């Protein structure tokens, strides 16, 4: 399946694809941003570097590559921006030089057909050396989805927030990554909403997106059963194990290359895997839309059921009491990490939740997360707001009652 490409889409065209829950590529927008027109492109002369001139001494949280600490995108570490940026610049210019050398070698080969064998040998040696140098100089850190409003206010005027996110006071999130970097299979979400619509804009570089329609691939990917990771797939697309996940054999993929100056609309609950093909700088925007929210209570409800089942089957004993206390505090607005019923001290209350995930799911704030969009001020007077909240809340409560019945009939054993 090919996805549509639309130049400077109107509001009506955005709405059409949001309601269809279909991705499309946007052109003619990003390439008009100040950031795209040379401002964010690294200068060969480091003294003229724009980012260093305004961000050099800023402390930022970065992700450390290759360290498995149970964090999906890598271990978080705070470092000075200049340390990160100088290393990324080095990687960027190494890549550009390698690309230019390959282009020159190809031109030389075309002009010197009589020396093909020698040229090919030299090219292979040069390419091997360039690849080794590029690998050796890959950054140790990368930026993953840092809110620009929070960490990089100096950059706010360098890009245009698309109309719908802007109406909702949503700002952009900055990504700065290296060649061959992978973001594993997932769909977009927030802590208060299990499914978000999104836009991904590339200012520098290219990325490969592997997209999976949630309707076509409804039973292909099992969710992780860990708090904060329910939007992530257990199936590793880069190292597929079809013996462990036989259902994944049936997936249907849409593969696209998103180029510099283009933006991709990623609809709600679409699974996607991302590979960075070149050193890249990107901005993404998440937003809500009542039209696509309504899909969660009908044709996308199966994914909400899978989400609920993942929470229900979570092994809460693997979560530390301190972390679990924060979860309960968030869901109950109780500073003591309790449930407000006065039944036992903090640790006893936490243990009650650990022993019964259904108790966690029944908390009003957790149930309300499925209709989180109705709290968005822009939807205050939307005619379908109350309908959506009623429908999705009813479905979640029905799921809870059915699960209780299964437990009472001993069809389910709570671990």
UniProtKB/Swiss-Prot annotation:
Q: Outline the segment boundaries, as ranges, of region: Disordered.
A: 97-140
The UniProt entry, under Gene3D superfamilies, shows: Cupin
JmjC domain segment(s): 127-302
**GO MF:** 2-oxoglutarate-dependent dioxygenase activity
Concerning InterPro entries, the annotation shows:
Cupin_8 (IPR041667), JmjC_dom (IPR003347)
Signal sequence region:
none
Mark out the compositionally biased spans (Low complexity). 104-137
Q: Which protein is depicted? A: JmjC domain-containing protein C
Species of origin reads Dictyostelium discoideum
